[in-house]
Amino acid sequence: LSDLLVKNRRIKMKKRSLSVLMVLSLLLALALAACGGGAAEEPAAEAPAADAGAAAGEAAEEAAPAEAEGEKITIKLAENPWTGSMVNVAVAKILLEDRLGYPVEVVTIDENAQWASLATGDLSASLEVWPSGHAENVAQYIDGQGVVENIGLLGPIGKIGWYTPSYMIEKNPALVTWEGFADPAVAAEFATAETGDNGQFLAGDPSWVQYDADIIKNLGLPLQVVNAGSEQAILAALDSAYSREEPILFYFWTPHSIHAKYALTEVGLPEYSDACYATAAEGGVACDYPADELFKIAWSGLKDAAPDAYALLKAMNYTTEDQISMVAAVEIDGKTAEEAAQAWVDANEATWSAWLP
């Protein structure tokens, strides 16, 4: 019996030991699970990648204004109402858009109004200024305020004058100078219903630089100025008169393709002088127009706002013959200014490539 009691006591002790071991094992498992749970949270380390993405987004947003600032501005070119100006602008537009990637807007505006727009940056550049008519503008906007810049010569030499068909000189050689028109009977040959007894002097667009009314008054000529309204209107009147060999006296200029199409004679006026033109503001001009070295002007801020566009326009320079070839394509061949300019660009890469910055 005593042996049996001892045996039972040993069995119970073993059971208690097993229970303790099981409890210890369970506690150990829980501890390991807790440690393992901590390890399972390691994917949270991916958070910095998300933060980097957010930072990249913020950086992109911060960079956006910088990119916007780097966008090319629209270059606004002044187109004056004559064909030479139109083809100049068309050439510049092609190169600015195709070679430098600038958007270009062509603004039709008269040659006097353009100065105020250039001063404010509403216009970027004008590519054909005739200096004899713009002394006051140069003094105010370039020399005085410094808001417009002379960006160099275009190349062609221009000359405004009085013209009549050469057949009129053959009929009356005295008409080769202004003195031939001083005779009222001779001047009356150029009269129209609009001018009565006076001869008609056909001018162009009223916005053009022209001193003809002053010249006529100061020389005492029996002539009256009538504005045709445009270059095309002068050419139409010339074509009509020429086909009938009728008298016509008109304002025109070189370079222009009409001198290849028609036999014209420039009427001699008293020789140009600086002293004569010093009286222009008071209506005192009584002499010929000067030979003009055509030049280009730009908004003074263009150099900083669009340095490569500024460089191209500043370098732009070609010959009188270059310009006449494009004007002839428009006036004689019936092409648009854009078509004439593109043909010139296609044929003259050696010239314009030197303008590129």
PLM feature segments, named:
Residues G146-F201:
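A conserved helix-loop-strand patch within extracytoplasmic ligand-binding domains
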Residues L30-A34:
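C-terminal motif of bacterial Sec signal peptides marking the signal peptidase cleavage site
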Residues K159-E170, D292-A305, A328-A329:
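A bilobed periplasmic-binding-protein/Venus flytrap-type ligand-binding module shared by bacterial periplasmic
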Residues G70-G84, Y102-V107, N198-L202, L313:
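Short, well-ordered beta-strand elements
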Residues G36-G38:
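Bacterial signal peptide processing site
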Residues N80-T83, P103-S117, V226-A237:
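Short helix-initiation/N-cap motifs at beta->coil->alpha
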Residues S117, L123-E128, Q200-S273, A278:
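Ligand-binding pocket segment of bilobal, Venus flytrap-like solute-binding proteins
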Residues V89, I109-G146, A236-A237, S257-Y262:
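Pocket-flanking alpha-helical
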